[in-house]
């Protein structure tokens, strides 16, 4: 069996759909929302790598590496903010985020 680009696109679309569903179905837990955003970014990366391999061009793979770097920084900053928020409030529920003073 030959794995074609359509297989990669189907898997990527499923990952993207699961990520969107994770955001919309679970609005109470911030960690699951962050994980869903990471899943969406990974599905976009899979698209870049699939098209890069299909077109024999390395630009998509380089762009995917940049996206992974930004996603790792975003996850680290998001988790650091959650740790500080949990220390101050004792909860990481989304309902408690909108009562922040700034």
UniProtKB/Swiss-Prot annotation:
Stored Gene3D superfamilies: 1.10.287.3510
Reactions it catalyzes: a quinone + NADH + 5 H(+)(in) = a quinol + NAD(+) + 4 H(+)(out)
UniProt keyword annotation of Cell membrane present: yes
Compartment(s): Cell inner membrane
One Gene Ontology molecular-function label: NADH:ubiquinone reductase (non-electrogenic) activity
GO CC annotations on file: NADH dehydrogenase complex; plasma membrane
Stored InterPro entries: NADH_UbQ_OxRdtase_chain4L/K (IPR001133), NUOK/Mnh_C1-like (IPR039428)
Documented EC number(s): 7.1.1.-
Chief subcellular location: membrane
Enzyme class: translocase
Keywords: Cell inner membrane, Cell membrane, Membrane, NAD, Quinone, Translocase, Transmembrane, Transmembrane helix, Transport, Ubiquinone
Main function: NDH-1 shuttles electrons from NADH, via FMN and iron-sulfur (Fe-S) centers, to quinones in the respiratory chain. The immediate electron acceptor for the enzyme in this species is believed to be ubiquinone. Couples the redox reaction to proton translocation (for every two electrons transferred, four hydrogen ions are translocated across the cytoplasmic membrane), and thus conserves the redox energy in a proton gradient.
HAMAP family in alphabetical order: NDH1_NuoK (MF_01456)
Protein name in the entry: NADH-quinone oxidoreductase subunit K
The gene coding this protein: nuoK
């Amino acid at each position: 069996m030959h794995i074609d680009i359509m297989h990669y696109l189907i898997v990527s679309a499923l990952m993207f759909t699961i990520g969107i569903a994770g955001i919309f179905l679970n609005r109470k837990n911030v960690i699951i929302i962050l994980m869903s955003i990471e899943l969406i970014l990974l599905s976009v990366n899979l698209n870049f790598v699939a098209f890069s391999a299909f077109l024999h061009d390395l630009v998509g793979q380089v762009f995917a590496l940049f996206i992974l770097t930004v996603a790792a920084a975003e996850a680290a900053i998001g988790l650091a903010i959650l740790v500080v928020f949990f220390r101050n409030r004792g909860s990481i529920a989304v309902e408690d985020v909108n009562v922040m003073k700034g």
